[in-house]
Amino acid sequence: MKNHIFKAYFNAKSASFNFRYDRALLLVRNPLHQILAFTDWKTRNLHNNTRLPLKFYQDFLDPFFNKHVELWQKWHERVLESFSAENICVINYEDLRENVLEELQKCTQFLGFDIQNHILQNCILQNQTGHHKRTARPFGETQLILSFLSKKTRLKSDEIYEKTLQKLLNNSYHSDKCMG
C-alpha cells in the first residue's frame, strides 16, 4: 500500500491529476473559503502578511470564483472516481473546526490507529497553534469580500458545494464506518 500525503491547491492541471495512491484522506472545505485562503497564500510573498487590497476583490472576484468553483468540483469528482468507498475518508473542514476530536478520531480510525481519547485530546490541546499559522483576516473581512460576489455566483457555489460534499460523504468510508 502506498502511504503518501499530499496537499493540493486545485488548478486546471489538478482536475486531471492521476492519483497513484491506494487510499485517501480528503479534507473538504467550502470552495469560497478555500479559494480565499488559496489567494491569500499565493499572494502573501512568503507569509509577510500582506493581503490583496479590497479593490482587487471588487473588480475580479466574480469571474475568478466562477472559474475556480467549477475546477473545485471537477477535482473532487476526480477523487471520487479514483477511490472506492472503503479507501477514502472524507472530513469536512468546517466540521473539523467545530468538532476537532470527533473528526480526528474518524481519521485515525480510517488509518487503523488505536489511539485513546485522552492521548489524542492532549496532543490536540497542546498543538493547536504554532508559527506556521497565518494570521486571520480582521473580523468581518471575509464576509465583506464574499459580499462582492453576485447572488448568482454565491448560489452556484453553494449548490456545487452542498451537492459535491454530499456525494463525497455518501461514497466514502466516512459515511459507512465513522458516523456512529
Language-model segment annotations:
Residues 6-7, 26, 90-92:
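Short beta-strand segments
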Residues 45-106, 110-111, 115-118:
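PAPS-dependent sulfotransferase catalytic domain
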Residues 21-40:
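Conserved phosphate-donor/acceptor-positioning beta-strand/loop module used by diverse small-molecule
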